[in-house]
Amino acid sequence: MREYTYAWNPIDYDDESQPILKITKSSFGSFQWCPQKYFFQYPLRMPIDQSPAMAKGSIVHNSQEDFFNTFDIKKAESMSPSEVKSYCMSLFPVDDHVDMYDTMATTATQRFVEARDEGRLSEYLPPGNEVMLDAEIVIQPDWNPKAELSRPYRVHIQGIIDRIFQEDDFYIPMELKTGPWKDYKRTMMRKEMAFYKLLFDNSSPDVLRENGLNPEYDMKYWGWYYPASNYT
């Protein structure tokens, strides 16, 4: 792979020693929201203030990652549903987001009990927990009829997938969001998950194996979880 950067120069594209454009899910979303904001935040790397919502998102995301890294299936296997719920709550920190953790623990308990009843505990923990993937794709000139290119461009895409669950011989990426669910977010979420699908499909087998994933498996479905609204 070539080096990559947000601050690329298309004039240097044919020079193999120069970096190509880097696109992440976040930078793509920022550009769609406001191209000028994207330019300040990514190519210029201007710092932005962290809002309370951003801080909350980081804390809860880290807590969910730690939850799946710590959860012991053998320990919970013989527990009653109420005991599983208490166990799940014990894996979350005690901070200002306890109400959200309670919802997340309830969801985790329901998933565990259902998996146990169906004999699918081997699929309870995600094989991918905060997985960062890298790939290269070629943008064809006619992909966007509103902004046709004069030539194809190879770009580097990168993203961190919150969770990748497995069901039989396929994967299901699941995105965690800490804000409230609104119906207008559905289009945005589909774009985010489609980005992950594109990233997964174009990652090399070696990259997938390094992240504990089977390159022979496909992503057939996707989902998102908004615990603030108890919406999946």
Name what the model sees in each region.
Residues 30, 39, 59, 128, ...:
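Generic structural signal for residues positioned in beta-strands
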Residues 59-147:
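A non-catalytic, helix-rich entry segment at domain boundaries
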Residues 52, 56, 101, 189-192:
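Hydrophobic (often cysteine-bearing) scaffold residues that line and stabilize catalytic clefts
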Residues 131-232:
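Mg2+/Mn2+-dependent nuclease catalytic core
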Residues 23-26, 35, 123-130, 134, ...:
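Sequence-level motif detector for i,i+2 pairs with an aromatic at +2
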Residues 26, 110-122, 177, 202-213:
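Intrinsically disordered, low-complexity boundary segments flanking structured domains
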Residues 50, 95, 182-186:
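Active-site oxyanion-binding pockets that recognize sulfate/phosphate
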Residues 1-83:
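Charged, glycine-rich intrinsically disordered N-terminal tails and low-complexity linkers that flank
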